[in-house]
């Protein structure tokens, strides 16, 4: 992840190169090509939003997209330190490329009959969720609308995922925020630069994330921050949390799990499977009995 300013500090740029992260998500969830693009865009967006909206160095933002399309809902979590994770409801859902231009039909698989919701922590530690109705279904335009409508942040958002040979070759995102004092001339130059960039994935392939940011801020005196953060797939699940999740089941249900030789718990975020032994499940009952004594 790279951050910077341009035009004398009146533009703020945040970028993420997430090719390895999205490939890891594709592999873990066995995602179809179009589902990979939809989730990858959402994951990149979550990291960018964490930087723009977060108040701490370890702030997290969760983005949920539910447009009623074949892929079902999409959920992604990103943090300011580059940790990302995410999943979709129907990982195998896919659509043929669009007939008009041959590109992946992300809008079709996501749908537009629903909303994009963003959850973050306020200064007091309480979670806050804002949302907008989906209009594009392409993710980037909807994230941009969210920032403008719910957060009153003038912005431009670019997101992209490109697969080659069944693997993610390029994935990432770029968010540009207009700060107080920005001039119409600067905005016009920025708009022209973005229009000339073409596909973000082409920029990432040819010049990397730095090249993409330089292209977006061409002629606007880009100044990069020195606190670059590598992006990586990271899930907070653990065996201990898997065991704790069984506390929501009654004693009879847990006894059935013990009688059947244990229980498998699946983490939806990363598809990690935990096979819990009868002894681990029985220990829950013993712990509850001691607590009640």
Swiss-Prot record:
Function: Redox regulated molecular chaperone. Protects both thermally unfolding and oxidatively damaged proteins from irreversible aggregation. Plays an important role in the bacterial defense system toward oxidative stress.
InterPro entries per UniProt: Heat_shock_Hsp33, Heat_shock_Hsp33_C, Heat_shock_Hsp33_N
PANTHER family given in the database record: 33 KDA CHAPERONIN
Predominant localisation class: cytoplasm
Localization terms from the record: Cytoplasm
The organism's place on the tree of life at top rank: Bacteria
Changes after translation: Under oxidizing conditions two disulfide bonds are formed involving the reactive cysteines. Under reducing conditions zinc is bound to the reactive cysteines and the protein is inactive.
Keyword S-adenosyl-L-methionine: no
GO biological process, one term: protein refolding
Keywords assigned: Chaperone, Cytoplasm, Disulfide bond, Redox-active center, Zinc
Organism in which the protein naturally occurs: Deinococcus radiodurans (strain ATCC 13939 / DSM 20539 / JCM 16871 / CCUG 27074 / LMG 4051 / NBRC 15346 / NCIMB 9279 / VKM B-1422 / R1)
Family: Belongs to the HSP33 family.
Gene Ontology molecular function: protein folding chaperone; unfolded protein binding
GO CC list: cytoplasm
Pfam families the UniProt entry points to: HSP33
Residue pairs linked by disulfide bridges in the UniProt entry: 235-237, 267-270
Listed name of the protein: 33 kDa chaperonin
């Amino acid at each position: 992840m790279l951050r910077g300013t341009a035009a004398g500090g009146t533009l703020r740029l945040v970028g993420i190169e997430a090719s390895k992260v999205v490939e890891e998500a594709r592999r873990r969830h066995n995602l179809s090509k179009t589902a990979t693009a939809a989730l990858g865009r959402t994951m990149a967006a979550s990291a960018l939003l964490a930087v723009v909206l977060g108040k701490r160095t370890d702030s997290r933002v969760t983005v949920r997209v539910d447009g009623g399309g074949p892929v079902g809902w999409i959920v992604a979590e990103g943090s300011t330190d580059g940790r990302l994770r995410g999943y979709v409801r129907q990982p195998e859902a896919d659509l043929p490329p669009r007939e008009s231009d041959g590109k992946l039909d992300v809008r079709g698989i996501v749908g537009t009959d629903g909303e994009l919701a963003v959850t973050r922590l306020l200064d007091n530690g309480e979670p806050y969720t804002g949302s907008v109705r989906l209009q594009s279904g392409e993710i980037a335009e909807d994230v941009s609308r969210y920032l403008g409508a719910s957060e009153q942040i003038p912005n431009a958002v670019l997101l992209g995922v490109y697969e080659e040979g069944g693997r993610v070759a390029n994935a990432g995102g770029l968010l540009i925020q207009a700060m107080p004092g920005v001039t119409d001339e600067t905005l016009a130059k920025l708009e022209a630069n973005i229009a000339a960039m073409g596909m973000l994935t082409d920029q990432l392939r040819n010049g990397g994330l730095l090249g993409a940011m330089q292209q977006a801020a061409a002629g606007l005196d880009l100044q990069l921050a020195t606190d670059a953060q590598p992006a990586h797939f990271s899930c907070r699940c653990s065996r201990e949390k898997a065991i704790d999740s069984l506390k929501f089941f009654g004693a009879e249900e847990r006894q059935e799990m013990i009688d059947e030789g244990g229980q498998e718990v699946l983490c939806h975020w990363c598809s990690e499977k935990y096979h819990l032994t009868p002894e681990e499940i029985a220990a829950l009952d013993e712990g509850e009995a001691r607590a009640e004594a």
